[in-house]
Amino acid sequence: MQLVTASEMQKIDTYTVNTIGMPQDVLIERAALSVIDVIGAGHFNLEHILVLAGLGNNGADGVAITRLLYAQGFNVSLQFVGNVSRAKESVQRQLAIIEKYGLVRSEKSDFNEATLIIDAIFGTGLNNLLPEGLQKMIKAANHIEKTVIAIDTPTGIDATTGEVRGAALKAHTTVTFGYNKIGLTRRVGGYLSGNVIVKDIGLLTPPDFSFSDTEENHSTKDV
């Protein structure tokens, strides 16, 4: 199976949206539906689902996932990590939709009440240390050992190197899109990603694209 770096994944995303013409919202909906499939096929405690959403496309996926769960009657809460007014347009569009469903996002949620946490804070675009406040929140969540499903990559994991950017949310399952990421197969990233499930959401590679690595060259114990 082919592996990609964060920058290679960005090239694939850009090509699919800008050259092929696939709307970003279509990819977001497909990503969200694929996560719903994973949740439905797994043996997760769905009594109270908490979705933690960031301000970028990963957060937009999280909002769409929240909407789909809410529409199916699940007890789901949506909490943003960061100032929503600074969120990308993709997030704002998803928010406008979910508000019409009547769901009110939470300003602050109690991790202890959640039986399942959806990590949609940062995906493959993370290239800096996480803010100190977010690091503290992640460490608190890890301490109480809640079941976490990470969207694309666990927050805090460098998708290229597998290194931790200050702190990382430990996932039971990671649903990643298009292709697996090198950082989910090596170093700490391989351990913190849990069970990695790759979902096809319709991303296309440019004609001149070449994969930098394959999964056979890595393992989760690679240090």
Swiss-Prot record:
The residues the record assigns to binding (6S)-NADPHX are N57, N58, G59, A60, D61, G123, T124, G125, L126, N127, N128, L129, D152
Q: What reaction is this protein's catalytic activity?
A: (6R)-NADHX = (6S)-NADHX; (6R)-NADPHX = (6S)-NADPHX
| Highest taxon, organism lineage | Bacteria
Q: Give the gene name.
A: nnrE
Free-text remark on how the cofactor is bound: Binds 1 potassium ion per subunit.
Q: Organism, per UniProt?
A: Leuconostoc gelidum subsp. gasicomitatum (strain DSM 15947 / CCUG 46042 / CECT 5767 / JCM 12535 / LMG 18811 / NBRC 113245 / TB1-10)
Q: Does the keyword Zinc-finger apply?
A: no
Residue positions annotated to bind K(+) are N58, D119, T155
Look up keyword Cytoplasm and say if it applies.
Answer: no
Q: Which family does it belong to?
A: Belongs to the NnrE/AIBP family.
Q: Please state what the protein is called.
A: NAD(P)H-hydrate epimerase
Question: GO MF terms on file?
Answer: metal ion binding; mRNA binding; NAD(P)HX epimerase activity; nucleotide binding
